[in-house]
């Protein structure tokens, strides 16, 4: 089963061309939508809402979760403490605290990061699966949740996935007297840096 929450880049996505939505594709709308996965222990409930300018301020008061479940909440937007580069909706982590959330899955930021939401839950940007430019440097992949359905304890693991990663590296060329010397300095750096053959590396020359 696939759970698909559209973000600000998904207008006119592949779904609009489908004559019929497959049964195993679960989607979200402009109001909270929840899907329950029954287990022998705690139920796992995945809840999400697609944000726009009309509902972005009201989703916090309308979120109601059963604390006996393992609650995954899915949102796409920019966490409020960071400046958004585009028209992404702002997500207030403060207003999602103490709601019974175990795992807050966030989309929009293309870099992996994780933090504590409150005493119970964590939040995570899994990032994009592969860097698309030198502004998305570093390792990319996805996050696996291993949930104990009895205790509700969770282990999270970041899984590198990208076929090739993008890196930005600074090479100090102080003391080089020619472009040949600088080229040699860069080659020496690349020989020892350990980048995979498929990597894309942008070299920034520093020094004097």
Name each region found by the language model.
Residues 1-146, 153:
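His/Asp/Glu-rich metal-coordinating catalytic cores
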Residues 151-208:
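Accessory, non-catalytic peripheral segments of nucleic-acid enzymes
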């Amino acid at each position: 089963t696939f759970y698909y929450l559209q973000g600000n880049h998904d207008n006119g996505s592949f779904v609009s061309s489908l004559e019929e939505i497959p049964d195993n594709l679960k989607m979200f709308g402009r109001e909270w939508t929840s899907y329950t996965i029954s287990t022998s222990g705690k139920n796992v409930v995945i809840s999400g809402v697609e944000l726009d300018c009309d509902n972005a301020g009201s989703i916090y008061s309308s979120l109601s979760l059963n604390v006996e479940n393992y609650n995954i909440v899915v949102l796409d937007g920019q966490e409020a403490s960071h400046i958004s580069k585009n028209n992404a909706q702002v997500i207030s982590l403060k207003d999602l605290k103490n709601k019974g959330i175990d795992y807050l899955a966030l989309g929009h930021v293309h870099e992996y990061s994780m933090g504590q939401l409150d005493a119970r839950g964590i939040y995570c940007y899994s990032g994009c699966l592969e860097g698309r430019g030198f502004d998305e440097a570093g390792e990319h992949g996805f996050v696996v949740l291993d949930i104990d359905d009895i205790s509700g304890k969770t282990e999270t693991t970041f899984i590198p996935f990208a076929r090739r990663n993008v890196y930005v590296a600074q090479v100090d060329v102080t003391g080089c007297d020619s472009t040949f010397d600088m080229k040699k300095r860069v080659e020496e750096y690349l020989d020892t840096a350990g980048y995979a053959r498929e990597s894309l590396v942008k070299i920034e020359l520093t020094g004097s």
